[in-house]
Amino acid sequence: MADTKPAAKAAPETSDAYAIVEASGTQIWLQTNRYYDLDRLQADVDETLKLDNVLLVKDSKGTTLGQPYVKDASVELKVMAHRRGPKVIVYKMRPKKKTRRKNGHRQELTRVMVQSISVGGKAIG
């Protein structure tokens, strides 16, 4: 009797290549074809951005560490939307003084999709 197991579905194409970049005052780990929420960037929706502050690039050939930045490396991002993060409540109370203060804050965010990571003009991953 033949084995009648269904064929395994192919996983979506993912790559182990990644880059660590500086954006919005923070260091972010980025992979291609994924979206990330960064602090608000001054860019329009559907605009393409190029980040040159690449600190590290890893691909199948090895890891390249910048000092402080990797030479001729860049990450291309597409702005998908401008959003606001979850509301954070700050509540301050002084006991026995009837003093209470309640503040809310929502961080302004930009959702971006990583289109490509390139080193020396060649896309990786």
From Swiss-Prot:
Q: InterPro entries of this UniProt entry?
A: bL21-like, bL21-like_sf, Ribosomal_bL21, Ribosomal_bL21_CS
Q: Which GO terms describe its cellular component?
A: cytoplasm; ribonucleoprotein complex; ribosome
User: Which keywords fit this entry according to its UniProt record?
Assistant: Ribonucleoprotein, Ribosomal protein, RNA-binding, rRNA-binding
Similarity comment:
Belongs to the bacterial ribosomal protein bL21 family.
Protein task = This protein binds to 23S rRNA in the presence of protein L20.
Q: What quaternary structure, including any partners, is listed in this protein's UniProt entry?
A: Part of the 50S ribosomal subunit. Contacts protein L20.
Q: Name one GO biological process term.
A: translation
Lineage runs:
Bacteria, Bacillati, Cyanobacteriota, Cyanophyceae, Synechococcales
Query: What GO molecular function annotation could you give as one example from this UniProt entry?
Result: rRNA binding
rRNA-binding listed as a keyword: yes
This one is known as: Large ribosomal subunit protein bL21
Q: Check the record and name the HAMAP family matching this protein.
A: Ribosomal_bL21
Spell out the NCBIfam families in the cross-references: L21 (TIGR00061)
Keyword field contains rRNA-binding:
yes
